Amino acid sequence: MTESTSLRPAYARLLDRAVRILAVRDHSEQELRRKLAAPIMGKNGPEEIDATAEDYERVIAWCHEHGYLDDSRFVARFIASRSRKGYGPARIRQELNQKGISREATEKAMRECDIDWCALARDQATRKYGEPLPTVFSEKVKIQRFLLYRGYLMEDIQDIWRNFAD
């Protein structure tokens, strides 16, 4: 058995695993690398794949070539998904950074997305605290803290009351 034939099963297992992972949802390249490097849980506990670094690179390249792995598509879908769940731009940026997406790619996608963050912040505040929003200082501070935790920028939060007064 030659070395190239002995590496073939490891590459095939890695490729199969990558396609299965990417079939569930989009992943960033760094996420996919981390998941591929993790041991597989078998019947007798964790099993290591005896794949080389070259096998990992070939699998990642194959996924890019065939459209299974695309960081720009992942970023756009991630921003849309997290904003629908009520998270603001600061939190989304932080989560994308944790997933290995570059700051430039994140900023580009944030500029291209058509999301009104102020309206989204207002929707989150009214969903949690009711309509009309409280004007008492102590209640405004609670709402502000809640929205900051959700990742909204201070200027968007202040615009809620500025627009509310108009």
From Swiss-Prot:
Pfam families linked: RecX_HTH1, RecX_HTH2, RecX_HTH3
Subcellular compartments: Cytoplasm
Single GO cellular component term: cytoplasm
Classification via InterPro entries: RecX_HTH_1st (IPR053926), RecX_HTH_2nd (IPR053924), RecX_HTH_3rd (IPR053925), Regulatory_RecX (IPR003783), WH-like_DNA-bd_sf (IPR036388)
Keywords per UniProt: Cytoplasm
Main location class: cytoplasm
HAMAP family xrefs: RecX
Family per record: Belongs to the RecX family.
Function: Modulates RecA activity.
Identification of the protein by name: Regulatory protein RecX
